[in-house]
UniProtKB/Swiss-Prot annotation:
It catalyses: L-citrulline + L-aspartate + ATP = 2-(N(omega)-L-arginino)succinate + AMP + diphosphate + H(+). GO terms for molecular function: argininosuccinate synthase activity; ATP binding. GO terms for biological process: argininosuccinate metabolic process; L-arginine biosynthetic process; urea cycle. Its EC number is 6.3.4.5. Keywords: Amino-acid biosynthesis, Arginine biosynthesis, ATP-binding, Cytoplasm, Ligase, Nucleotide-binding. Pathway: Amino-acid biosynthesis; L-arginine biosynthesis; L-arginine from L-ornithine and carbamoyl phosphate: step 2/3. Pfam families: Arginosuc_syn_C (PF20979), Arginosuc_synth (PF00764). Homotetramer. One of its GO terms (cellular component) is cytoplasm. This is Argininosuccinate synthase.
């Protein structure tokens, strides 16, 4: 392999503690002339269980050291909240839980690499997935001078058995089992599930797929209401508790909503999506807190933004969903779209009540000092602010283009009848 002959002195590996990245450490040292391997692990809220013993595992696999970087608060505050303001939902369903975590992980990865003086970075993404593109696009934007190593595009190993044998031959301990049914990825926003029976789109997900939320059928029979308070587009309170930067903070707010939503089976989706690399894939996602937050935020938008502003913000959200999914966070386009969404969010101050019940998160109350809703205008009864006779002129002008088209093309119903 020509690429493997390139001189690399020090490489920083994005390390999870799993089978793949545990095998990558000795592979790097063997294929890149005994280079020093430093492990980097990003804590984006995947849970203590996932991070338990990760430093020890990395050292046991051959890494010289392991950096575990706590990114939880920054992730929610600087990535999730700005994306929330765009209203981005990929292909109408997916709340982008995996995609939105990649930019901050890539940034922290590069920061560690520059700190230790590495000349390369390495990831464990497969050659079929989206993440290889997302990470490497971010690397290119942040540190184009660094070499990127992607073992799954180089080595000959193709199965979990191959990886386990590789580690066993080198007497490297690994607790991974030969049979792993599902591939999962978790962070503060969500958890994703792929593989196993999910590879057949006609197969219903088993109960074992879902690990974060209660089955909606088993959720409480009594609904629960959650009140969210926003200030200039930022979540600052839930049920009267301060979650602003002066209070418990953004990460704790999301954890609170995750707990509430999970108990009521909120946030489950089972979708087939179009991958960036061209193929379709099926995934099951659990985003309980995010589903509540998105419902509340959009509920506030409908109360405050005028029609044309909301229409434009929705167009930004549609385009930005692809920007995030494709890994283009560190681009001028992303910066412009985030700024646009943030400008609309400045008006979004108010309270929203969301009812949680057996998988449903429904907005049932909303109020704001910036509300454009006027009961006087909206009523169907008599009022002093809107003369219904004025509608006739509006309708005539609104339908003028249709009238002209019909007259010029003889396309009216009368002409057709004749």
């Amino acid at each position: 392999m020509a690429l493997a002959k390139k001189t690399i002195k020090k490489v920083v590996l994005a390390y999870s503690g799993g089978l793949d990245t545990s095998a990558i450490i000795p592979w790097l040292k063997e294929n890149y002339d005994g280079c020093e391997v430093i492990a980097f692990c990003a804590d984006v809220g995947q849970g203590d269980e996932e991070l338990e013993g990760v430093k020890e595992k990395a050292i046991a696999s051959g890494a010289s050291e392991c950096y575990v970087v706590d990114l939880k608060e920054e992730y929610v505050k600087e990535y999730i909240y700005p994306i929330l303001k765009t209203g981005s939902v990929y292909e109408g369903q997916y709340l982008l839980g995996t995609s939105m975590a990649r930019p901050i992980i890539a940034k922290a990865h590069i920061e560690v690499a520059l700190k230790v003086g590495a000349d390369a970075v390495c990831h464990g993404c497969t050659g079929k997935g989206n993440d290889q593109v997302r990470f490497e696009s971010c690397f290119a934007a942040l540190a184009p001078e660094l070499t990127v190593i992607a073992p799954w595009r180089e080595w000959d190993m193709v199965s979990r058995e191959d990886l386990l044998d590789y580690l066993a031959e080198r007497n490297i301990p690994c607790a991974a089992s030969l049979t792993k049914i599902y591939s999962r990825d978790a962070n503060a926003w969500h958890i994703s599930h792929e593989g196993g029976e999910l590879e057949d789109p006609w197969c219903e997900p088993s109960k074992e797929v879902w690990t974060m939320t209660v089955d909606p059928m088993d959720a409480p029979d009594v609904p629960e209401k959650v009140q969210l308070s926003f200030k200039e587009g930022e979540l600052v309170g839930i049920d009267g508790k301060d979650f602003s930067q002066h209070g418990a903070g953004a990460y704790e707010a999301l954890m609170y909503l995750n707990e509430k939503g999970s108990a009521h089976g909120v946030g489950r989706i089972d979708i087939v999506e179009n991958r960036l690399v061209g193929m379709k894939s099926r995934g099951c996602y659990e985003t309980p807190g995010g589903t509540i937050l998105m419902a509340a935020y959009k509920g506030l938008e409908t109360l405050i933004l005028d029609k044309e502003s909301l229409k434009y913000r929705e167009s930004v959200g549609l385009e930005f969903s692809h920007v995030i999914y494709d890994g283009r966070w560190f681009t001028p386009l992303a910066k412009a779209q985030l700024a646009s969404a943030a400008s609309f969010a400045e008006k979004l101050t108010g309270d929203v009540v969301v009812k949680l019940y057996k998988g449903m998160a429904q907005v049932i109350q909303r109020r704001s000092p910036n509300s454009l809703y006027s009961e006087a205008f909206a009523t169907f009864g008599a009022d002093d602010v809107y003369d219904q006779k004025h509608a006739e002129g509006f309708i005539r002008l609104f339908s003028l283009s249709s009238r002209i088209t019909a007259l010029s093309q003889k396309d009216s119903l009368k002409d057709k009848a004749e």
